């Protein structure tokens, strides 16, 4: 049933951790509006992000940064046809729990904050450097790999130049 919801005209939310990266990706998608048959939008604030999500029942491509999720506790949207795509998923997308330190300060992981804001969304993480340590695991946060695009494929596609190492 989860796959049916994803195929049911989802709203795509693209999350980055930096404004310059958000602007770059938004610009790339904006140039493809005719191919995508819709115009991407960039959320200006948490309130604007909520308006963009609540103001539609389906479709749409919304760009935002992680920081916009930090400003509130209430869910932004409870729809199940939202797909969250996180770029550079190895940076800052950890912590599904809340922890209390010796002084009683509560620390909430970024992954938990986003999932509280969009509790019924599906999540996809994009990274070139997945992390796997005790308290930071890209696979734990986003699940198994959907696809792996390695350096050999990138060179074959002319997406990157080959890297050569010469021992001295």
Predicted regions: what is each one?
Residues 1-3, 7-168:
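RecA-like P-loop NTPase motor core of helicase/translocase proteins
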């Amino acid at each position: 049933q989860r796959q049916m919801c994803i195929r049911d005209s989802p709203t795509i939310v693209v999350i980055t951790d930096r404004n310059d990266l958000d602007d770059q990706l938004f610009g790339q998608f904006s140039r493809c509006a005719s191919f995508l048959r819709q115009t991407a939008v960039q959320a200006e604030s948490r309130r604007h992000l909520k308006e963009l999500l609540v103001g539609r029942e389906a479709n749409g491509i919304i760009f935002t940064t992680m920081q916009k999720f930090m400003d509130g506790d209430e869910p932004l949207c409870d729809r199940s046809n939202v797909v969250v795509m996180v770029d550079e998923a190895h940076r800052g997308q950890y912590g599904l729990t809340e922890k209390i330190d010796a002084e009683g300060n509560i620390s909430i992981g970024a992954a938990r904050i986003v999932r509280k804001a969009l509790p019924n969304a599906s999540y996809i993480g994009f990274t070139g450097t997945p992390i796997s340590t005790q308290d930071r695991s890209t696979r734990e946060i986003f699940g198994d790999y959907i696809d792996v695009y390695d350096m050999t494929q990138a060179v074959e596609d002319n997406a990157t130049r080959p890297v050569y190492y010469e021992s001295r």
